[in-house]
Amino acid sequence: MFKLCGWLLPRSRTLFELRKAGVMPFHSTALTLSENDKIDSSIKVAEIPKKGKAKRLINTVNRSKDNDGHSTWRDNTALPDWKRQKFALKEKLNGERWNPKKKLSREQMETVRLLKRQFPHMTSGDIAIQMKVSPEVVRRILKSKWEPTEEELEDIQRRWKKRSDRILDLYENGKIDGYTGIIPVTRKVVIGGPNSEHIIHRKKPQQDLGPSNKLHYNKSKHIDRGAVKARNNLHLLLKKKI
């Protein structure tokens, strides 16, 4: 059949012309040729594109740069700020996984959400200055919509209680030095980072001054700083009166 087509049609015709002439169907993707036909035939079969070739082409276009060597997203003023931030972060991390050095606790994350609800005009940069973290950390916290259920909250409280009991046992067994018999356990709400200059609210634990007849030096030679400071202030007052 193919030899008959070769006699009727010129050898310069392409595969598309054969299909258009009705000799070959359009849906065929392969030809079965004899050895003589492979030698004598000048018909070139179009190469079928490989799988994933289009995806690689799209990635190449996305990674294309202009003549100055800068990425195209830098000069594209139509991009929104969040997308520019995403491109900048991807370029900064060099394709690595997001893993910040400083991580906020669960309470500090709730503080970030509380700040955004109470002060909607504050941007991610403003909150980041308060918490001493990068704006990307604040953006990811505000973007997350996950909230623990009641069962998860109970599990969190149970794990924290178990952890505090374990630490208390370490103190009592003498495995941790400096145990004084009382471990102040207080919960505090801090709106701002631990080293932030502007702290909106902080609840400090109350200091246990102990009995009034407490000695300056106890059996373990521990110095009572509060009593020493009070004694020095008393001497200064007496000198002023004299």
UniProtKB/Swiss-Prot annotation:
Lineage, top ranks:
Eukaryota, Fungi, Dikarya, Ascomycota, Saccharomycotina
Organelle targeting peptide span: 1-20
Read off the InterPro entries from this record.
NGRN/Rrg9
Role played: Required for respiratory activity and maintenance and expression of the mitochondrial genome.
Question: Which spans are transmembrane here?
Answer: none
Question: What family classification does the UniProt entry report for this protein?
Answer: Belongs to the RRG9 family.
* Source species: Kluyveromyces lactis (strain ATCC 8585 / CBS 2359 / DSM 70799 / NBRC 1267 / NRRL Y-1140 / WM37) (Yeast)
Q: What is this protein called?
A: Required for respiratory growth protein 9, mitochondrial
Domain of life per record: Eukaryota
Annotated gene: RRG9
UniProt keyword annotations, A-Z = Mitochondrion, Transit peptide
GO CC annotation, single? mitochondrion
Compartments in which it is found: Mitochondrion
